């Protein structure tokens, strides 16, 4: 084995036609799983035997494909504006922010309980041990149509009730960049924000989200193999007390070229396994014993050096600079971190 403990597996694209599938008003595993010889239930049994928690990604909101007999129609389930035009999700060009094309239709938050009902059936049918809530843990939108009018405050309540029902059903939920309304229900969070929104008015980043969550809900930041700068993102995780999150596929990266998923350009697991195991061990060893503690203070000591202090007095120093730094009698290597445990 690689010596990696406390793993969590997120399995995306397993239902309703894949990553960009049909509405979750009905749930059906993709047929390729059967051809591969491993059912959803068998996968989870295998992971459980290895002590790995599995979270199956579900989409309670986006509808990428609208097919005959899939139970969804925009007329019945889609949210709309006061003038009855559909509310949908568009993709935009990065260069100038102009609209590219429709990315997906939506399911009105009015039907959150109906979607949760379909997911609960799937939980029972396929013995799902955990769900990743995806966009529903952060994305709130209204529905202005008279027949199922739902403002954002009502939507928040409806999603909260759905999460509560799903938590009761599976026992384990994961959030994705989750807002406050999802926190009472989730056991783990991915894509937790590690830095500011980058507005020019801001001088420094403070890991506020991490400071609120640490010691209550374990979390990780973005998938670090997808980051522009792996090393900086890795150090951000250390500064913020976050777990390491990787997004992988079994096949070669070239499989995704010229598809809707070509943004996933660095995801073949074989290229990352050794690096991930090595970095995990380094962080796990250094931060052992701090997982359940609160972060009580965060300081920017100099331009490239931060200090995160935990409730037992332990301090984690991160140096983003290209030269070694000295702080509190501790030398922090270039582009590295150092830990002073509270008992030292």
Show which residues each predicted segment covers:
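Structural preference for beta-strand elements that scaffold enzyme active sites
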Residues: 6-8, 53-55, 129-132, 172-174
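A mature extracytoplasmic/lumenal domain signature
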Residues: 11-15, 135-137, 321
